[in-house]
């Protein structure tokens, strides 16, 4: 049994842990649009695209997946947060979205076995060595303990970059698969 009224989409929402308030419950999901620069920095075109969502009334805007490691890039035009030089354009995006009344979240990502060797120059990494047609060896590379610790550290450093850019919340995902 519901003990209180269900909120309406136009109602604001307060995040219990952080106290941040979204002006409404309309959330732009993370969508890949392949507009970022080759070095992973978010482009002015992508900044404009995301900011238009805030201008249009979304309470929360979520970035496309942002890779945390150079070897974790899953596709061309993907946002990166694996280097400090990528913070400034993120800061610009955050400022614009906030000025238009929205909150912005980043989706941090490592492509794992879905990070093509053609983009990264490295054999895709996975939880175990398995057949994989997009690898020059025909297999993924099994993640070592060192790899796992490095990727954890990469997520941590990317999260710190998000904080430096002023992002409010983070979402995490990876593709280590089998």
Predicted regions and their residues:
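Non-globular sequence segments
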Residues: 95, 103, 109-167
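N-terminal capping/small domains of soluble enzymes
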Residues: 1-109, 151
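Short connector loops/turns at beta-strand edges and beta->alpha or beta->beta junctions
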Residues: 33, 66-69, 131-133, 176-178
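Short acidic/His/Gly/Ser-rich catalytic and metal-binding motifs that mark active-site loops
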Residues: 69-73, 115-117, 178
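Short beta-strand segments at enzyme active-site cores
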Residues: 61-64, 104-108, 165-178
């Amino acid at each position: 049994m519901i003990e209180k009224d269900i909120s309406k989409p136009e109602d604001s929402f307060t995040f219990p842990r952080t106290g941040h308030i979204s002006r409404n419950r309309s959330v732009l999901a993370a969508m890949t649009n392949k507009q970022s620069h080759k070095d992973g920095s978010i482009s002015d075109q992508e900044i404009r695209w995301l900011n238009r969502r805030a201008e249009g009334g979304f309470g929360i805007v979520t970035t496309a997946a942002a890779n945390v490691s150079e070897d974790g890039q899953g596709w061309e035009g993907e946002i990166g947060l694996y280097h400090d030089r990528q913070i400034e354009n993120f800061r610009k995006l955050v400022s614009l979205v906030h000025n238009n009344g929205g909150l912005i979240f980043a989706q941090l990502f490592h492509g794992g076995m879905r990070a093509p060797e053609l983009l990264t120059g490295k054999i895709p990494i996975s939880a175990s060595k398995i057949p994989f047609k997009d690898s020059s060896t025909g297999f993924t590379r099994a993640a070592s303990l060192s790899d796992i610790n490095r990727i954890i550290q990469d997520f941590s450093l990317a999260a710190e970059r998000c904080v430096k850019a002023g992002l409010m919340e983070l979402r995490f995902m990876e593709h280590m698969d089998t």
